[in-house]
Each structure stands twice: as C-alpha cells, then as structure tokens.
Amino acid sequence: MKVFRQQLEQLGAQNQYRSIPDLIHQGRYITRENRKMLNMSSNDYLGLASDENLRRSFLQQYGGNFPSFTSSSSRLLTGNFPIYTDLEELVAQRFQRESALLFNSGYHANLGILPALTTTKSLILADKFVHASMIDGIRLSRCAFFRYRHNDYEHLKNLLEKNVGKFDRTFIVTESVFSMDGDVADLKQLVQLKKQFPNTYLYVDEAHAIGVYGQNGLGIAERDNLIAEIDLLVGTFGKALASVGAYAVCNQVLKECLINQMRPLIFSTALPPFNVAWTYFIFERLPQFSKERSHLEQLSAFLRREVAHRTQIMPSETCIVPYILGGNEATLAKAEYLQGQGYYCLPIGPPTVPKNTSRIRLSLTADMTTDEVRQFAACL
C-alpha cells in the first residue's frame, strides 16, 4: 500500500487530488457542506433535468405500465427491447441518416468505436484536445496515430499528405464543441479535407452540442448543414437531453461492423428500457426547445464578454465559458471564493487541461435568468 499512498500524497502536493463530493441537488441549486449554491458547473444545458412538467408528462404517458427497470443482459443476448430499436429509428430519421446505434455512455462509445473499425494497418489523426474517452479508444486501437495541433487544419493536412498512402484507412477524430475551452471545430474544413484523401473517414463527437445547436437541436453538424458528410456522428443523452447513454449515426455497414466488433457494446449489460424510454420522450421533443436554445445563447454571449474583460483570454463560442487563471492555487482559491458567494464553480487543472491553463469551467443552463448571470458576473 505504501506506493499507492505516496501517489496520493504526490497528487495532493500538486493540488491534483480528486475526491467525490457529497451533494444535495435541488433543481438549479446544489447544497454542499451546508452551503446552497447556484450550479454553474452543470452540463444540463437546456435545463431539462429538473423540469417537473416533463417528468409528469412522461410518467402519465405510461400510466402504471412502465418499461422494465433492467435489461438484465447484453443486447446481443436477451437484453434487447423494442424501445431500443424505436429510439435508434427515431434518431436515424431525425438526422436523415441510414442508421443509428445506442451505447451505454459517451465514454463507452468513444472507447469502443475506433478499436472496432481500425486494424494495425490503420491511421488515426486526432485533435490535440479531444476528450479522454477518445484518447483511450485510440490507445486501445493499436494502430498508428498522430495528434494534430488544436483546430490547426494546415497541420492536419500535412499529416494527411505524409501518411495516408501508408495505411489501409484513416480516421480524422474531433469534437465539435470542445468540453474545456468551449470553442468549435470547423467541420466544413474537416469535411473538405476528408474528401481530398482516399479511404479517409470523419468521426465527430457532438457530446456538448447535441440539443444546444441547430434548428432542431441536432448539433453543430446540423447548424452547418453537414450531417450527411460526416461518417460517424456521435453524441450523448446525458447532458442537454437530461438522460443517459449515447448514440452514433452512420451508414448500415458501419453499424453492423460495430455490432460485430465493438467490445463495450457486445459485452455490456444494456441500459434499462425505462431510461431509454425517457430518452425517446425527450429526443422526440428536441425541436420544441428553440426558446431554451435562444435564451442560452444570449446568456452565454453576455458571460463570455464579462469573462474576457477580466482575463483577455476567451476561446469559447458556446455556453461552456472557461475562466482561465493559470496556476492551480489561484484557481482553487477563486473557486472557493465563488462558492462562498453562492455559486457552485469547480476548478479544472492538469492533466485535464494543459499546464498553466487551470481554469474554472463555467457552464450555463437555459433555466438560469439574466439577472442571475449578471449577479454572478459581478462577483468575478
């Protein structure tokens, strides 16, 4: 045990020690250590997670005849239920794509997709800032990979020119909205690059965009009219959609490859049908939340301006607003101060973000009021 204690002590000395907090949730508020605070760190972007009207409508829809609370098995054994197929068909229809496939979480999706679709003769080119789940999927793929500089498409093009001919297939991997900086990938440029090289596929994670962007809330790819051009479009239900699980939209061939070769899908007990039914209920109503999306964008634009005045650094274009302070100690102190003022703000430091870019990751939700965000900004 000594070596493990030393590791923990080292993390503590570097202000990188993590622990699971004891929290009480009350709608938009969180109580921690007897302090009730407005939650400024949630991924519940549309503010649906505590919407009692939605919950009531969902429960009334089923009366007392609820879907099963467990699948008890993998979908490939006895764990498949009609509601899974119903949701996959709805997702594919909304995206106007041939197929969709469900996963237990965004982490499961990103962990399993690339290993299932690559060989030791394949190449992966990933944005430097992609999520840890994508990095883990890349590592499990056992194929060659390079990480291009963040949103630097000249660097990506150079890597493509030097390497594509040496491999049987190439995957370009990116997020659309990046989870720590809140900036947005140029999907149009990525599609154009993909088309210039043979056997090259584009894989985009819309975890922080689904529900929030696009006329129907389908993400940045919808906003930019590029859904049909992206080979694998992945998103989660656990953020703006207030549920659990994830999806990929793709063609039928890729879907069947994933069903046959994706280990996290094959060997995991499927999500409870009850949860999938809730996801269906929310996803079906996604186009109706345009008012929430518009209000969220107004709040976000205001807070981005306020933070930029204080830091002179503002990469964000979205409702994820990084308040970059640099060092760990300053960031921890600022987070503690803001919590004392009644705002649940969390510090983010290395290795989650690059060294000397520790920040408070602020994320806004559509159920916040303009006055609440103004009062918060005054505390910065």
Swiss-Prot record:
The name this protein goes by in its record: Putative 8-amino-7-oxononanoate synthase
E.C. code: 2.3.1.47
Reaction it catalyzes: 6-carboxyhexanoyl-[ACP] + L-alanine + H(+) = (8S)-8-amino-7-oxononanoate + holo-[ACP] + CO2
Function in brief: Catalyzes the decarboxylative condensation of pimeloyl-[acyl-carrier protein] and L-alanine to produce 8-amino-7-oxononanoate (AON), [acyl-carrier protein], and carbon dioxide.
Lineage: Bacteria, Pseudomonadati, Pseudomonadota, Betaproteobacteria, Neisseriales
Family named by the database record: Belongs to the class-II pyridoxal-phosphate-dependent aminotransferase family. BioF subfamily.
InterPro entries hit by this protein: Aminotrans_II_pyridoxalP_BS, Aminotransferase_I/II_large, AON_synthase_class-II, AONS_Archaea/Proteobacteria, PyrdxlP-dep_Trfase, PyrdxlP-dep_Trfase_major, PyrdxlP-dep_Trfase_small
Residues annotated with N6-(pyridoxal phosphate)lysine modification: K239
Top class in the EC scheme: transferase
Gene that encodes the chain: bioF
Gene3D superfamilies: Aspartate Aminotransferase, domain 1 (3.90.1150.10), Type I PLP-dependent aspartate aminotransferase-like (Major domain) (3.40.640.10)
CDD domains: KBL_like
Sequence positions that bind substrate: R18, H131, T352
